[in-house]
Amino acid sequence: MNPDYWKGKTVVVTGGSSGIGEAILSALSKIDCKLINLSRTQPELLKRKGAFPAELLHIQTDLSSEREIDKAIKKISKEYRGIDVLFANAGVTTHSRFDGTRIETFRKTFDINFFGPIYLIQRLLPQIKLNVGTVIATSTVSGLYGIPGRSAYSSSKSALHAVLEAARIELSEQGVSFVIFCPPYTKTKLRASGLDGDGNPLNEGYYPSRKIKTPEEVALKMLNAVEDPESRLVIMDSSGFFLKWLRNIAPAFLERTLFKKLYKDFH
């Protein structure tokens, strides 16, 4: 991370009250920049004693609600002129079989992971264009292939990928950058606040993996990705490359591998 890159920039972060979003805010709070957090709850950063160089504004927002996004945009437009970076970070996971997931749960997952982010991006786009800015979306390797036990989650992220890839090409002449960032398993509340097939909270703990990352590790990689003008699809660990490669080279082998590895997740 290059602190000089971020000096004076105006940065919007969604879901900054915990996890990766909070880690992004924490890292940037040490730099003289303007930070705007959109989330339902206030970031811990604002509750701590002592000043920090960054200017931080929290706007309480339900990111699945167009009405609340509109209110947040109105406040941002009144306070700031131009956005340099948007971290579209807020999201929800859903764990259940395809035939055990209610259509209402699919809709709720898409409202948070797809419709919310693209509506926010569309509404902020005039401000982002003004500063020739960057949009970086927190996604998942589950968006690269349909993962068993994650049909709603995978499909919502795959849809987001497609929109941002199209937007990247369409807006390339105006200099707007779009980055899709796929972190590995991370120590966040994602599984605790996720949904089961009926739309109820999962209340699951961290994924049992020796390779699990901290939010701070992921945030640093995301900040580096924004700084790199060549960033497009950034995959942080080998599992994502494995999925991308095998889906084209050996799809039947990939399906058998996922069936065995994730069998307990959909039975």
Tell me the role of every PLM-derived stretch:
Residues 97-98, 102-107:
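Substrate-binding pocket helix/loop in short-chain dehydrogenase/reductase
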Residues 121, 156:
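Active-site helix of classical SDR
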Residues 140:
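Residue(s) in the substrate-gating loop at a strand-loop-helix junction
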